[in-house]
């Protein structure tokens, strides 16, 4: 008797990533405390971290904290960077006025906030060496994938 296709996919996923149960903690930015990833990994699933907003030192700390609490699998996920925005002060002023109707005034410099350096985040992930690295909204550059594979880090596409 053959397995149901869904069970076959779940079994293959578990085998590929050495899991006991097909549970994957969603790697959401700012919503993945190490303690939760540890609990998921210790229960046999895959812990996760959405590193979009994390500086390199925070990536290192998260991986170190998770390693201290589990021998189970976990992933670090990065959002592929968007192209630089084309700024338009008139449009930004209109958006700030609109948002000001619903809460505190948005300062003009709010649009100047820059995300963490993507290359530095990638380096931090390679140095920290999570079980798995994954991406969303695109693929890593080939040079990064080659280095990741040379370190034995799995890539979940």
Sequence positions of predicted segments:
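Active-site entrance/lid segments in N-terminal catalytic domains of soluble metabolic enzymes
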Residues: 2-157
């Amino acid at each position: 008797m053959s397995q149901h296709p869904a069970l076959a996919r779940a079994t293959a996923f578990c085998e590929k990533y050495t899991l006991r149960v097909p549970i994957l903690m969603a790697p959401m930015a700012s919503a993945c405390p190490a303690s939760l990833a540890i609990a998921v990994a210790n229960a046999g699933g895959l812990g996760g971290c959405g590193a979009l907003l994390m500086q390199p030192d925070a990536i290192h700390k998260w991986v170190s904290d998770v390693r201290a609490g589990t021998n189970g699998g976990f992933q670090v996920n990065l959002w592929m960077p968007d192209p630089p925005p084309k700024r338009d002060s008139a449009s930004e002023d209109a958006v700030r006025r609109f948002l000001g109707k619903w809460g505190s005034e948005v300062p003009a410099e709010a649009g100047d906030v820059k995300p963490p350096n993507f290359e530095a985040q990638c380096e931090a992930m390679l140095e920290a060496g999570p079980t798995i690295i994954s991406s969303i909204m695109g693929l890593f550059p080939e040079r990064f994938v080659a280095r990741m594979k040379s370190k034995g880090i799995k890539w979940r596409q």
